[in-house]
Amino acid sequence: MDEAMNGPDADVVIVGGGPAGMMAGLLFARAGARALVLEKHADFFRDFRGDTVHPSTMELLDQLGLLERFLARPHNRINHAAVVWNGRTFRIGDLTHLDTPAPFIAMMPQWDFLAFLKDEAAAFPGFRLAMKAEVTGLIEEAGRVTGVTLADGRLLRAGALTVMADGRGSLVRCQGLLPLKGLGAPIDVFWFRVPRTLQSGPQPGNALRGVVSGRTILALIDRETYWQCAWVFEKGQAEAVRARGIAAFRAEIERAAPDLGDLSAVLPDFDAVSLLSVSLDRLTSWHRPGLLAIGDAAHAMSPVGGIGINLAVQDAVAAANALAGPMAAGEPLDPLLFRVQDRRMLPTRVIQGAQKAAHDFVLGPIASGRRETASEAPAMLRLFDRVALLRRLPARMIGYGFRRERLTAPAATGGR
């Protein structure tokens, strides 16, 4: 990484070391490119980031010959989903019937998943990862992005492409470099953990459980030793919730999910709770000459369905499929960038449409108090619970998403 003008620092400079950026770095390096990933933090450790690795992502790992090593890392598995509606449980999803090497959701802390990708990518000679490398600007020459500037003043030049995979706070968003369409989100989420004990808590079952009771909406994810819990509330009301006090917050959770037990030791104050400000938006153009946005930088997703990581990985695969071969052949990439957006925009719009419908017609009205939870569960929940075959439909959408990618990008020498 030299400022000298005697050549590019990498063929592809990737801004952001999240799932999209790390997977893109691995795939471009696998194809023989010099791929430089820039991550602004000193490590990958962030609590309450997406921890769900879905079957579509594990299919890709299987294609790469990495699935066995991935599953050797500590994780737990989710293969069923249910909703508890005013105290009655309805089964709504069953992943065990998916025809895939890993018919379950692997729950793994995101920092472990990223460390795994880093270790596997390091087997390719063209891969480099720079931590504490904060990008503050883009280098543009003759109307084309040719690299980035770092907070310490260094200039890093990309020989072929700059990929923005720097999340919903992306430089291209903050500086208005690509057009953004907001879809609105009427909810925010508080995350917290409840340790599992022998005396209390839902019975283990490798399940994702939603709870709807009165105005309370909870999601509980089985993490074996604890429950990862999400409490949904009206957008922008975090301070109002805090002002009511932690005792009132605990009481609402305990009423909705009494099997979690007494939460006074688990939630002594709001320091034990993390806020997720929910966004739902997308760029209407993901590229400009020399630059491509993928992952959350291109589309911020709601936590509904827990599919953000997997969409980001699918974007990285689509980018490598469309661009890695031409990059290796020395072809200009600018005329090809539209292919990535064309491939990935429809899945983005379909999934965001489903999330927006969930926001506008279920989560938002209940969380805001505009609508009380009906005493009887919706007919669709009752139907899924009665007909086991139907439970495969939501499982398929959650497990595979829409238009999942198959890896076609070339592989050069290297790797394990």
Question: Model-flagged regions — what are they?
Answer:
Residues 2-9, 59, 63-175, 183-193, ...:
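Conserved N-terminal helical subregion
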Residues 4-5, 321-416:
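C-terminal helical "tail/cap" subdomain of flavin- and related membrane-associated enzymes
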Residues 6-18:
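Beta1/beta-strand and adjacent pyrophosphate-binding region of the FAD-binding site
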Residues 21-22:
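N-terminal Rossmann-fold NAD(P) dinucleotide-binding loop
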Residues 29-49:
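Glycine-rich FAD pyrophosphate-binding loop
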Residues 42-62:
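Conserved N-terminal glycine-rich FAD pyrophosphate-binding loop of Rossmann-like flavoproteins
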Residues 143-155, 160-278, 282, 287:
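Conserved FAD-binding catalytic core of PHBH/FMO-like flavoproteins
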Residues 287-303:
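Short FAD-binding loop at a beta-strand-to-alpha-helix junction that anchors the flavin cofactor
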